[in-house]
């Protein structure tokens, strides 16, 4: 397959105002997508966004490009990424488009696409869009121009869907939950879901202003949530990222519960109910503790490359239903077509309510190996991973760890970062080894 020019692992993403996240490019992207999608069936596209101030500008640019290609754009306003996937299916649209940079700061943004089935676009469709981007932009005749409209009931539809994934015989009555919406797209969705199911809720990160998305709140920074859970003596806390496809939880003692632990709880509960189909997909970053805990339960486990796209590929390949990344992407294919943080949270809470156990007690069956992740920023065309010094440092650490740990070096798919991960039984040694490799990476940049 030809090398991608514009699409990364999660659509097109970058710094707003710099290529490719400029109004002219995004308009051309809308047109190029329209050229491809118009040949596939209906000419209706669902468009959602998170709460970044640049979303308004990029929304208008997309609208112009799609209209020039003759497509009808249906705008949801601020809406979680998985909600757009769901609405794309229920409205029988040809595609869904999300304007978001997920967990990144407000000054980044991006465009990602969903197919009519609510899944990420196949590689061949993305490559077809890239091919159109390199052609001169044209416009259909005036009578065939696309029109734009708003989906005023989008939020209500998605709230009802989320609630439908929670067992009808259970209730959240009596639970005190702290909800952190990262000042992002779930701010008007998640509180209503949990409240309508009976919980007492306390919210943080629910006051977006266009520039505070993911800032010291949300799934990538749970310190505020940890403090609030302890202060309020809540049963637990739930944090979402800016576009609502990642979840991190916090137990009653303020301890973080990541995507690995969440997937373990959901899989174990499905096994208890006799409803587990197959095994669990993790990634190269998944904690060894999860692998060991699942093995002890007799649940198969495989690893994919990092990225929810690759988790999904492994799930489909094995015909399994549960996949996750430790960063908080949790995919439950019996309920959704992509990572959905609210739905994942509800399944964990169903386990809490159904088992009459606390979140901490549910996590106790899985002992986490100490895992240190160091991000090293790099610039230029050189590849630090090809450095002999880096290879030597990695080999040295792997020899010291033996069978009792792992080393993983990889490039980020969305930022100019080398991610150095070291995992083992001794936290102090793991930290030392990770820094040893990170120093070698820095020196090679």
Swiss-Prot record:
One of its GO terms (cellular component) is cytosol. It catalyses: alpha-D-glucosamine 1-phosphate = D-glucosamine 6-phosphate. Its EC number is 5.4.2.10. Its cofactor is Mg(2+). SUPFAM superfamilies: Phosphoglucomutase, C-terminal domain, Phosphoglucomutase, first 3 domains. GO terms for biological process: carbohydrate metabolic process; peptidoglycan biosynthetic process; UDP-N-acetylglucosamine biosynthetic process. Mg(2+) binds at residues 102, 241, 243, 245. Gene3D superfamilies: Alpha-D-Glucose-1,6-Bisphosphate, subunit A, domain 3 (3.40.120.10), Alpha-D-phosphohexomutase, C-terminal domain (3.30.310.50). The active site is at residue 102. Keywords: Isomerase, Magnesium, Metal-binding, Phosphoprotein. It comes from the Bacteria. The modification Phosphoserine is found at residue 102. PANTHER family: PHOSPHOGLUCOMUTASE (ALPHA-D-GLUCOSE-1,6-BISPHOSPHATE-DEPENDENT), PHOSPHOHEXOSE MUTASE. Belongs to the phosphohexose mutase family. Catalyzes the conversion of glucosamine-6-phosphate to glucosamine-1-phosphate. This is Phosphoglucosamine mutase. It comes from Aliivibrio fischeri (strain MJ11) (Vibrio fischeri). The lineage of its organism: Bacteria, Pseudomonadati, Pseudomonadota, Gammaproteobacteria, Vibrionales. The gene is glmM.
